[in-house]
């Protein structure tokens, strides 16, 4: 069976790509290794996204995602100090699964393993996946890698972009211009993303006495 769009991986990008492709009328197949959708927003528990406080960024599918969660959460989303909004991981999971199930042109198969891939020239023709106890051959016109580690890209030996993009490339207002990329040491020292620091402490000896005070 051949599909208009085949998405490998159900991370945040993979789930969004599958939903949006199906909404545009494409016969879409979503293949995921695990039984969950959403990646960082659900399975990884990163449910207090930062950097999205500006309403002008809350557009498209992301805007619909946030507004739907807000409408369905009586307690609201503004109850954490990390971000202007936060939600429980299962809320993200349930919403994404509901969107997937509502689309007749989108089929989701979970518990899949990427086994092999066939190319003709520079195009993927088909893939073999182990899924639900059988080996299946999948044909598609368009392929999207929505996995965490680029499984499909690596197997296809496909070219990919890594690192910062200049403002001139896509006319992205917030991106650094080409001159800054070439001359500012920050962009060579941090070629992918600014670091996220985590501070951990280790107790030695006995644990401190529990306080008798009540909050």
What label would you give each PLM region?
Residues 1-11:
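Beta1/beta-strand and adjacent pyrophosphate-binding region of the FAD-binding site
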Residues 2-4, 24-27, 104-107, 140-141, ...:
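Loop/turn elements at helix/coil->beta-strand transitions in domains of secreted/extracellular proteins
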Residues 6-8, 17, 122, 140-142:
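Membrane-embedded transmembrane-helix bundle of lipid-linked glycan/lipid transferases
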Residues 10-11, 85, 133-136:
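Alpha-helix N-cap/helix-initiation motif
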Residues 14:
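N-terminal Rossmann-fold NAD(P) dinucleotide-binding loop
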Residues 17-21, 152:
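Buried hydrophobic packing segments
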Residues 20, 26-27, 32-116, 120, ...:
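Conserved N-terminal/central alpha/beta ligand/cofactor-binding core
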Residues 40, 65, 70, 110-111, ...:
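Flavin (FAD/FMN)-binding glycine-rich loop and adjacent Rossmann-like elements that form
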């Amino acid at each position: 069976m051949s599909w208009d769009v085949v998405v490998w991986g159900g991370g945040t990008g993979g789930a969004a790509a599958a939903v949006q492709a199906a909404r545009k009328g494409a016969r879409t197949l979503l293949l995921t290794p695990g039984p969950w959708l959403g990646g960082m927003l659900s399975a990884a528990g990163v449910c207090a996204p930062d950097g999205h406080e500006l309403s002008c960024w809350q557009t498209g599918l992301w805007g619909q995602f946030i507004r739907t969660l807000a409408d369905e959460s009586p307690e609201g989303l503004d109850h954490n100090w990390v971000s202007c909004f936060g939600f429980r991981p299962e809320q993200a999971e349930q919403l994404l699964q509901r969107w997937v199930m509502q689309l007749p042109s989108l089929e989701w198969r979970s518990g899949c393993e990427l086994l092999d891939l066939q190319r003709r020239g520079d195009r993927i023709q088909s893939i073999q996946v182990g899924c639900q106890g059988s080996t299946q051959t999948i044909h598609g016109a368009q392929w999207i890698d929505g996995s965490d580690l680029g499984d499909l890209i690596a197997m296809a030996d496909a070219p990919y972009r890594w690192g910062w993009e200049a403002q001139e490339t896509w006319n992205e207002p917030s991106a650094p211009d080409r001159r800054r990329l070439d001359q500012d040491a920050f962009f060579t020292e941090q070629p992918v993303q600014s670091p996220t620091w985590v501070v951990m402490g280790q107790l030695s000896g006995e644990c401190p006495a529990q306080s008798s005070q009540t909050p």
